[in-house]
Amino acid sequence: MSLRFAVSNEIELKPLARNISRSISNNQIILFEGEAGSGKTTLIRYILSEISKSEKKTFSFQGSPTYQREHIYNFNKFNIIHFDFYQVQNNKLDLDEYFYDYCIFIEWPLENLIKRYNHMALSISISVTGKKRNIEIK
């Protein structure tokens, strides 16, 4: 089953981000796919912001971890590790060591990670059509 949404601006992402933020926990993997500039990082920022609001906690988004490869966000209910594998060539990456302690967000997931974790991951694909973002969640 998949859900599809079309948004015309960032503000329209907030309700979607709120719903996603309410459904995540440790031991979960979320794959964010889409071309550069499609809004993957923006959606992640909104999801993290919604978690922060629900916990009444100060939050500072660290941006996309393109060059550091990962950022960790500690919340009361769970922790999130945000990976960005843009331009990463190592297909031998393994997430098992993170799975039990984090909810794992992955931008630009590598093919081997998609194959290995797809059965247990939430996949969010964003495509661009004109000024609209088409979001598919499955």
Predicted regions and their residues:
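Conserved lysine of the Walker
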Residues: K40
